[in-house]
A protein has these predicted regions:
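Nucleotidyltransferase catalytic core that binds NTPs
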Residues: 1-178
Length: 178
């Protein structure tokens, strides 16, 4: 498990979330991140529950199955549930865990613009930025607020990048309604 991370000097993206359920938007940003940043792999780190959101509607085992199914053709995307391994659901602990596996990993933590707005409230967010570069994907209705957020103003410009998207405005909550 995670042997793909043991190669020297590889670039990985980490997209964390509940994936309730995984959808086309997750795939699109993963593909764009891979292409723009030349990532070797992207880990979809599935969490049991997001501390900033309501309880997931779909059980974690089912969310993992759905994620594996929709990423079948995208072999660079690795579906992982690591909370039990690292004994934590915090992003900082996940990043530290990955760095322990391979200190040469170049990690890019991927988030939507909506998450950047509250990023300064995340546990040890400044340390996350030291250990991983941040890729922020535009989300309709969040651009201005995210670019003016506390975290956006405090992060050094070399540690994060804002990526504009052509319209792919679909969220997990919209997917559940379909």
């Amino acid at each position: 498990m995670l042997n793909y991370l043991k190669k020297k000097n590889i670039k990985i993206g980490v997209l964390g979330g509940t994936f309730d359920p995984a959808h086309k938007g997750h795939l699109v940003i993963s593909r764009i991140a891979k292409k723009k940043i030349k990532l070797n792999y992207i880990i979809w780190s599935i969490t049991r529950k997001n501390p900033f959101k309501k309880r997931p509607k779909i059980a974690v085992v089912e969310r993992i199955k759905i994620s594996k199914k929709i990423t079948k053709k995208d072999r660079f995307i690795k579906i992982e549930f690591l909370e039990h391994k690292i004994n934590s659901k915090k992003t900082i602990d996940l990043i530290r865990f990955l760095k322990k596996i391979n200190t040469t990993l170049d990690i890019f933590f991927i988030m939507g613009a909506d998450n950047l707005i509250k990023f300064h409230k995340w546990n040890r967010w400044k340390e996350i930025v030291k250990l991983a570069k941040i890729l922020v994907f535009d989300r309709q209705g969040y651009k201005s607020k995210s670019l003016n957020s506390i975290a956006a103003k405090k992060m050094h410009k070399d540690r994060w990048k804002f990526i504009k998207l052509k319209k792919v405005n679909i969220s997990s909550s919209q997917t559940r309604k379909i």
